[in-house]
Amino acid sequence: MDLTVFFLLIWPPYVANGSAVFASRLKWRHPVDFGRNFIDGRRIFGDGKTYEGVAIGIATGTVLGYFPNLVYHVIGVFDAFVLSASAVLGDLIGAFIKRRLCMPRGHPAFPLDQLDFLLTAFLVYSLFREIPVVYVLAAVVITPVIHRATNYVAYLLKLKKEPW
């Protein structure tokens, strides 16, 4: 396994997923679901999923995800965009599932919270490029640890209300 390739593949989804939290600092936020409920009477995604967060996640994931490739030439801008946009999509899918399970915003849901963004990114990206199975397995193993650590740092920085 080429560790450089591995880390450059997981970098855009990690950045996209982690940077969306900065939208919570904005004064005005617009929920992706427009405050509407699903057929079960519960919110589709909830107030935590906003257009601003989606835009910040995709933009930062694409730009910062591509940046190291100016040196290493592993993935292109399109790749960084697909990985970032699909990571944000995965996070929305995770929020949708949590709302269906009656979990409130911010409630921990292992392993859904830790892997929804990454597995969706890999699934969508695999429609365009081959991803070695060993990379997916390695990412599934290390991502919960990295996710927990970065969320705790975001909590300490008061970017998140919960440390998970």
From Swiss-Prot:
GO terms for cellular component: plasma membrane. One of its GO terms (biological process) is glycerophospholipid biosynthetic process. It is a multi-pass membrane protein. Keywords: Cell membrane, Lipid biosynthesis, Lipid metabolism, Magnesium, Membrane, Phospholipid biosynthesis, Phospholipid metabolism, Transferase, Transmembrane, Transmembrane helix. It is an enzyme of class 2 (transferase). It is found in: Cell membrane. The keyword Nuclease does not apply. Pathway: Membrane lipid metabolism; glycerophospholipid metabolism. Catalyzes the formation of CDP-2,3-bis-(O-geranylgeranyl)-sn-glycerol (CDP-archaeol) from 2,3-bis-(O-geranylgeranyl)-sn-glycerol 1-phosphate (DGGGP) and CTP. This reaction is the third ether-bond-formation step in the biosynthesis of archaeal membrane lipids. This is CDP-archaeol synthase. The lineage of its organism: Archaea, Thermoproteota, Thermoprotei, Thermoproteales, Thermoproteaceae.
